[in-house]
């Protein structure tokens, strides 16, 4: 990724301010209207005070440098992946230089603090709706969660409920049939003494000697072994409505995101954006993907991705994505400190 940025920066040094404005205008117009952009159109929608011939010469240079291309003779120009990357980088600069625009986004205030699944569901649907993209959110790994409390609740002479409550409000519950009359309150107290503050992973790895081989360890293993989808998704219908994508494009995407290693390869430091060929899969060259992590304190606990057509509003989408990641990190950090 750094090599790509270095090459782009070297190419940008060959452009003067006017040519950068022309390129910016072409990309913005194409994103808005999804039609090739002519030199005349550049003059109509910009404040560039030069002749159409000058703009055409600039467009030839931009084409030579790989920022735009002409689909056929006498047509306007269309941005390449490199041109879209330029637009995205320019948007980042503008965002840093100006005060952040107010985003019409909902907050998480109405969602109970003890319901992380609802928080992730809300975040995914909000991100999909505002970006018109397809969203994948990785759930926190259950094995990394700290145990807050264990409960043994008798419900009849023969049955009791075994419950584990972890940070973020994630709980696992199972009924137990028992024929023994034991002091369940004392057993619950001892279990809490042993388990509270430990991660589920530590327990399952046998780090608590007194639990090794016990029925309770087997119960915990069976509870955590319950199948939970690693990712929740939202917004597939947005891609189906996008006129720049075909059903085949969408099928290709759905097939590729099944590959866990592929998804992990998309994540870098901070927010990473890959456009077209930068994704590294030929059958995904019509897409752009934004990826990033959300945190508990300083520790990353999950990744978020959203895929959209590469002809998209990079400026707005970057702000929205950053907002969602920050809110998720705030939520999981504050919940873990309760």
Curated annotation (Swiss-Prot):
Function: Negative regulator of class I heat shock genes (grpE-dnaK-dnaJ and groELS operons). Prevents heat-shock induction of these operons.
Disulfide bridge positions per record: none
Source organism of this protein record: Thermotoga sp. (strain RQ2)
Coiled-coil intervals: none
InterPro entries: GAF-like_dom_sf (IPR029016), HrcA (IPR002571), HrcA_C (IPR021153), WH-like_DNA-bd_sf (IPR036388), WH_DNA-bd_sf (IPR036390), WHTH_transcript_rep_HrcA_IDD (IPR023120)
Residue stretches spanning the membrane: none
Keywords recorded for this protein, A-Z: Repressor, Stress response, Transcription, Transcription regulation
Protein name: Heat-inducible transcription repressor HrcA
HAMAP family: HrcA
Top-level taxon in the UniProt lineage: Bacteria
MF annotations from Gene Ontology: DNA binding
PANTHER family in alphabetical order: HEAT-INDUCIBLE TRANSCRIPTION REPRESSOR HRCA (PTHR34824:SF1)
